[in-house]
Curated annotation (Swiss-Prot):
The active site is at S100. Mg(2+) binds at S100, D241, D243, D245. It is an enzyme of class 5 (isomerase). PANTHER family: PHOSPHOGLUCOMUTASE (ALPHA-D-GLUCOSE-1,6-BISPHOSPHATE-DEPENDENT), PHOSPHOHEXOSE MUTASE. The keyword Isomerase applies. Its cofactor is Mg(2+). This is Phosphoglucosamine mutase. Activated by phosphorylation.
Length: 446
């Protein structure tokens, strides 16, 4: 059982879970662990636009410099940009201060190794051990303390990186694009990238004030984007989340396109171009069965993992896949990036749109998603999933669905909630089986 790290770094309420004291210790512990050899060591630190980012950034700088690491400060930058710059700047470690799609009150600390990948469970466990040790005995001597420096050219570096993921013969000339940056980390780089590639860009969610990240904007709240696309008769809307590692698209009719549909478009395109390194893609247990059937019709498989982009990426790396993602919009393209990158994923979709010279609505809706119902059951103490009545209800629900659907029962990794999801060809049956399982869980949790 891990004490500090969850499935996506350390995350919680700022000045509640994520305190200056904890951030200081994380900096010291990670700094000690990633010092190898006698040369000067350095860490890059990026953040999103939350008010608490200043506090956490300052505490991390104190932690890293106190154990002799030099710090390169990037300011507000997307998570995938931090991962890319960690590699590009030959840093020993990368840090992103963000709570992704959560409200401004929360914040988090994500760590990347020198290769730009998120740290393994084993390395995170070792950092936890060091956090709880006597770090005062391992501080650097006065003459060996680290320095901190703010880097000014990082936006241009990431913009050039993102542009290079587009084939050289493809431009975005003639496209009217609305991009929603969620008042988050991509508020500068995303509109600039799209404009430099030739698009007419209308940007919303680009006025961060420390409090408005993800508030009624971004990939988890796309209504504002839908309205703007319809109002301006745009060709496409692109919604990023607070740290820009996920994306949701809106077509010219205002219809939403989720991560499953985006993966379907890219998978088909890459199969035709013989770019897939394996005959399939990697997704999670939450991806729609319609995606699996669509890929099967193309001769491609869908491998499922636990929920979380880190598990998708782990399977991709272990088994040689170069495309994977989540329904929520984390799209991982390992030819380009070591983590989900919302802007790069959107550019790959736009590549297909420009090549085919068809509207986004015709390119994107590759399959009809099966009816899917998701409900959450909150519980107190105990383990309701172990109760006989719940086990019986789950078994009965799966038997009723048979081969015409799926049932997924998943405890949340961040709160005392059990998620019940079912999908199938018959919507009425899907609703019934979810309600039966939810009722059994509520009685068991009472």
């Amino acid at each position: 059982m891990r004490k500090y790290f969850g499935t996506d770094g350390i995350r919680g309420r700022a000045n509640g879970v994520i305190t200056p004291e904890l951030a200081l210790k994380v900096g010291q512990a990670a700094g000690l662990l990633f010092q190898r050899g006698e040369y000067r060591h350095r860490v890059v630190i990026g953040k999103d636009t939350r008010l608490s980012g200043y506090m956490i950034e300052t505490a991390l700088v104190a932690g890293f410099t106190s154990v002799g690491m030099d710090v390169l400060l990037l300011g507000p930058m997307p998570t995938p940009a931090v991962a890319m710059l960690t590699r590009s700047m030959r840093a020993d470690l990368g840090v992103m201060i963000s709570a992704s799609h959560n409200p401004y009150e929360d914040n988090g600390i994500k760590l990347f190794g020198p290769d730009g990948f998120k740290l393994s469970d084993e390395v995170e466990h070792e950092i936890e051990r060091l956090i709880d040790s006597d770090l005062q005995k391992r501080l650097s001597a006065s003459a060996d303390l680290g320095r901190a420096k703010r880097i000014e050219s990082v936006h241009a570096r990431y913009i050039e990186f993102a542009k290079r993921t587009l084939p050289r013969n493809i431009t975005l000339d003639g496209l009217r694009v609305v991009v929603d940056c969620a008042n988050g980390a991509a508020y500068r780089v995303a509109p600039e990238t799209l404009w430099e590639l030739g698009a007419e860009v209308i940007a919303i969610g680009t006025e961060p004030d420390g409090f408005n990240i993800n508030r009624d904007v971004g990939s988890t709240a796309p209504d504002a984007l839908v309205r703007k696309v319809r109002e301006l008769r745009a060709d496409i809307g692109i919604a990023l989340d607070g740290d820009a590692d996920r994306v949701l698209v809106v077509d010219e009719k205002g219809q939403r396109v989720d991560g499953d549909q985006l993966m379907a478009v890219v998978a088909r395109s890459w199969k035709e171009d013989e770019r897939l390194t394996q005959p399939g893609i990697v997704a999670t247990i939450m991806s729609n069965l319609g995606l699996e059937r669509y890929l099967g019709g193309l001769g491609l498989s869908l491998v499922r993992t636990a929920v979380g982009d880190r598990y998708v990426l782990e399977h991709m790396r272990e088994h040689g896949y170069n495309l994977g993602g989540e329904q929520s919009g984390h799209i991982i393209m390992s030819d380009y990036a070591t983590t989900g990158d919302g802007l790069v994923a959107a550019l790959q979709l736009l590549t297909v749109v420009q090549r085919q010279k068809r509207p986004v609505s015709e390119v994107c809706h590759c399959f009809d998603p099966l009816p899917q119902v998701l409900k959450n059951v909150r519980y107190g103490a105990g383990e309701p999933l172990r109760k006989d009545s719940v086990v019986t209800a789950i078994e009965g629900a799966r038997q009723r669905l048979g081969n015409a659907g799926r049932l997924v029962i998943r405890p949340s990794g961040t709160e005392p909630v059990i998620r019940v999801m079912a999908e199938g060809d018959d919507r009425d049956l899907v609703v019934e089986v979810v309600d039966e399982v939810v009722e059994a869980l509520r009685k068991a949790a009472a």
